[in-house]
Amino acid sequence: MSSSTPNTLPLLSTNKSLSSPFTNNHSTFLSKPSQPFLHGRRCQSFKVSCNVGEHDKNLDAVDRRNVLLGLGGFYGAANLAPLASAAPIPPPDLKSCGVAHIDDKGTEVSYSCCPPVPDDIDSVPYYKFPPMTKLRIRPPAHAADEEYVAKYQLATSRMRELDKDPFDPLGFKQQANIHCAYCNGAYKIGGKELQVHFSWLFFPFHRWYLYFYERILGSLINDPTFALPYWNWDHPKGMRIPPMFDREGSSLYDEKRNQNHRNGTIIDLGHFGKDVRTPQLQIMTNNLTLMYRQMVTNAPCPSQFFGAPLGSDPEPGMGTIENIPHTPVHIWTGDSPRQGHGEDMGNFYSAGLDPLFYCHHANVDRMWNEWKLIGGKRRDLSNKDWLNSEFFFYDENRNPYRVKVRDCLDSKKMGFDYPPMPTPWRNFKPIRRSSSGKVNTASIAPVSKVFPLAKLDRAISFSLTRPASSRTTQEKNEQQEILTFNKMAYDDTKYVRFDVFLNVDKTVNAEELDKAEFAGSYTSLPHVHGNNDNHVKDVTFTLAITELLEDIGLEDEDTIAVTLVPKVGGEGVSIESVEIKLEDC
């Protein structure tokens, strides 16, 4: 991820006129104003309006799988211990905003990421939603027509033009700097770095961030109904960079992207620095499996989906979607082959300089809504410390505001929503099995003989005793079985990913994730902590496995086999112990 040279964006000529040569191709996708979808029933199939190429044959092949489309078949219910107390996070002190850092060597971002400080900084009011006449409906980017694309390009061009004044809070670079300041150590609270990743602040911060960014774009083209598109990477037909972002010379294009991942290349939602030599159909299948695991299996309750409370530790633990696919999409898009620090998308400080960042996070935000629709105990957190945490933003009129988490829980109340769309991962529970029966756990070393583990430099297997077996349905609803990795340490300036499997040994084919035995993955994106020289991260990693044990047929077993397969950076990962716990939701 880049050297100390910042991304330089071209300054466009000033044009205050709101007239523009929109392309009118009579598309049914979008009519003025920008209202691509209204309300409707969730559909079972979806036709895209963008042109398709040869690679779409594989997309259709995935569509033909009889488990791809349709809803239903979910397992809700229990999980995780109640959230620990952590004081509400106040908005950052802009007057003490400092230097942001890029890497563990102390490399400073060569420009200030701090926002302009308003004259009345000590009396910034709370934001109140303006009157709304109709919802802004965020469309899937891959299906957008040329009229919509022209509007989006124009709005982004005008935002870039505002960079003439480097202190204009509505300028493209100033908007990108919001992410840099909140994520690369520029803000401190109580002497600790303020970080909006790796905790329960992740979803609400980015929702508010996109809310104001979207409204600024709309104001620049006098269209209050303009809505950001979302990168539909959870659907096979959206698993590539949306075409509107891959046009050189467009205001939506960013030179600092991985050039090997352009022109319709299928994204790997588990990507961590290395391209897999796997057929496209298998990559898409793996993607849908990852989505099912992250949204359904591993996130039956709020604490696993949102992440851990932010307290004295600036990075207490991320939720399932932040882990995967959020982070791998950043890495896959960023230009790590040519840039020293993965710019733009591959580093927090520069991610907002790529317009695709906002499209990516629109789909991350959409996952918040989709997750709550699955049911069970999937609902917003009720912890007051979370609800009362605050952030600072400028609105489209350059007015400064404070905002609270509690006011962003319902996207419709904020004035935006997503159209009814198929979510094929909902019915993509892995059903194929690697083995026909139970692995002989007596032939595998017990956990006490394997841990503490000094380094995960190769695949390892071990047997683990469960706290209870043959649990009733009521017991499962009350408590989730949690596979827990205690005191896991690694250098958090390095890429890390390893996969976890149950009921298989270390000979498992880890390139095929669409197996019932695949439990989940752990990932980490390189990042820094301001001036902190200690980059060894000590975390607890958990996976909810109640559903998994049912699917594999191990509910009545007292002992199970667990296999860890390192993908990237395993040689730097140590784990003190592993256990299975029963925890309340």
UniProtKB/Swiss-Prot annotation:
State its cofactor.
Answer: Cu(2+)
Q: How is the cofactor bound?
A: Binds 2 copper ions per subunit.
Annotated Cu cation B binding sites: H326, H330, H361
EC number annotated for this UniProt entry: 1.10.3.1
Please provide the record's keywords in A-Z order: Chloroplast, Copper, Disulfide bond, Metal-binding, Oxidoreductase, Plastid, Thioether bond, Thylakoid, Transit peptide
Which PROSITE patterns has this protein been placed in? TYROSINASE_1, TYROSINASE_2
Does the keyword field hold Chloroplast?
Answer: yes
Q: What class of enzyme is it?
A: oxidoreductase
Identify the domain of life: Eukaryota
Question: Which reaction is the catalytic activity of this chain?
Answer: 2 catechol + O2 = 2 1,2-benzoquinone + 2 H2O
Query: Which amino acid positions bind Cu cation A, per UniProt?
Result: H179, H197, H206
Instruction: Classify the main location.
Output: plastid
Q: What Pfam families does this protein's entry cite?
A: PPO1_DWL, PPO1_KFDV, Tyrosinase
Q: Which family does it belong to?
A: Belongs to the tyrosinase family.
The protein's name in its UniProt record: Polyphenol oxidase F, chloroplastic
Record organism: Solanum lycopersicum (Tomato)
